[in-house]
UniProtKB/Swiss-Prot annotation:
The lineage of its organism: Eukaryota, Viridiplantae, Streptophyta, Embryophyta, Tracheophyta. Residues 1-60 form a transit peptide. Substrate binds at E148, L167, D168, G169, T170, G273, A274, A275, E292, D299. The gene is IMPL1. This is Phosphatase IMPL1, chloroplastic. Gene3D superfamilies: 3.40.190.80, Fructose-1,6-Bisphosphatase, subunit A, domain 1. Its main location: plastid. It comes from Arabidopsis thaliana.
Length: 371
């Protein structure tokens, strides 16, 4: 099963990304690092190509400067009795194990059932979650687990809560559309402590993956290399992402209006259909912001930490301090956060005035938090 999974080489998907990337070149088929002499020649060619440019406009940059200081941090202050390195090791292993199951199934016919009128679930969701659970239980048998398919499992008195989305973007997966992922995040006393998202890229017959990961206070990585949000400081130059839930209620209608509004004033708004992937794209610097109503803990637990550790900002859509147990999220590169809130927060407050509550809608009973 594992032989079918090719964890992505560190090549950017577009050649225009190469001048601003520090990721090592790898052969996308063998995964082996490209010959150093060849890499040196490529570097010289790229360097010479840009010598005449006095100012190179870039989006994603490697920088430790953060624009998130005005917003409360959401990451855990500590990982408790487990070291950050060990916790991240298991989180990544769990996500990659689930991704192996998905990779095995991605080009095969799928047996699709429905949880509602339009919320489909495949056998792959269930098999991926089972594989992830096996990894978590083997390493931390006393931890509490919240899975999208299996619900609550384990000891509710544990300080650790694993939030598992075994296949984020199931509809995309079912159609072979390249925007889906396996997402695993672990909370310590209610706050994100470690995260891993394995994103599927490519398309039918040429699927590949890249792995995003983060620990609280440890930075964000893509395929082991540090990443950072963009520095775009104007909405007019920003690429934005949102999502729509299955309930066509007032929140859905309000977000449709926000979608139209931001389409008029930004570079564009995308609706890709996988929350974890959307947030990782903000962390990578290829989009500036993502927002959505009606999300659940397993949708957000991994992605929000990766964004924050990449230098971004995370709040509720009304601007309040975010919790994984809330029902709305706005993530951004930090620079644009106040400008986005100027438009989004009033719409959210209007929904709240109608009795729609987006805060702390779901938390496992008896699970201790520091929120």
């Amino acid at each position: 099963m594992g032989r079918s999974l090719i964890f992505s080489g560190n090549m950017s998907l577009r050649i225009s990304h190469l001048p601003r990337s520090s990721l090592p070149l790898q052969n996308p088929i063998s995964g082996r690092t490209v010959n150093r002499t060849f890499r040196y020649r490529c570097t010289r060619i790229l360097s010479n190509s840009f010598k005449s440019t006095t100012r190179l406009q870039t989006k994603a940059v490697l920088s430790e400067v953060s624009d998130q200081t005005r917003y409360p941090r959401i990451g855990a202050k500590t990982t408790g009795t487990i070291s950050p390195a060990h916790l991240l090791e298991v989180v990544e292993l769990a996500a990659k194990t689930g991704a192996e199951v998905v990779m095995e199934a991605v080009n095969k016919p799928r047996n699709i059932t429905y949880k509602g009128l339009s919320d489909l679930v495949t056998d792959t969701d269930k098999a991926s979650e089972a594989a992830i659970l096996e990894v978590v239980k083997k390493n931390f048998s006393d931890h509490l687990i919240l899975g999208e398919e299996g619900g609550i499992i384990g000891d509710s008195s544990s300080d650790y809560l694993w939030c598992i989305d075994p296949l984020d973007g199931t509809t995309n997966f079912a159609h072979g559309y390249p925007s889906f992922a396996v997402s695993v995040g672990v909370l310590y006393r209610g706050n994100p402590a470690a995260a891993s998202v394995v994103e599927f890229v490519g398309g039918p017959m040429c699927w590949n993956t890249r792995t995003f990961s983060a620990t609280a206070g440890g930075g964000a990585l893509c395929n082991g290399q540090k990443i950072h949000v963009s520095k775009t400081d104007a909405v007019e130059r920003a690429l934005l992402i949102t999502g729509f839930g299955y309930e066509h209620d007032d929140a859905w209608s309000t977000n449709m209006e926000l979608f139209k509004e931001f389409t008029d004033v930004s570079r564009g708004v995308r609706r890709l259909g996988a929350a974890a992937v959307d947030m990782c794209h903000v962390a990578l610097g290829i989009a500036e912001s993502y927002w959505e109503y009606r999300l659940k803990p397993w949708d957000m637990a991994a992605g929000v930490l990766i964004v924050e550790e990449a230098g971004g900002a995370v709040t509720r859509m009304d601007g309040g301090k975010f919790s994984v147990f809330d029902r709305s999220v706005l993530v951004s590169n930090g620079v644009l956060h106040p400008k986005l809130l100027e438009r989004i927060a009033p719409a959210t407050e209007n929904l709240k005035s109608k009795g729609i509550d987006f805060s702390l809608w779901f938390k496992p009973e008896d699970y201790h938090t520091e929120l």
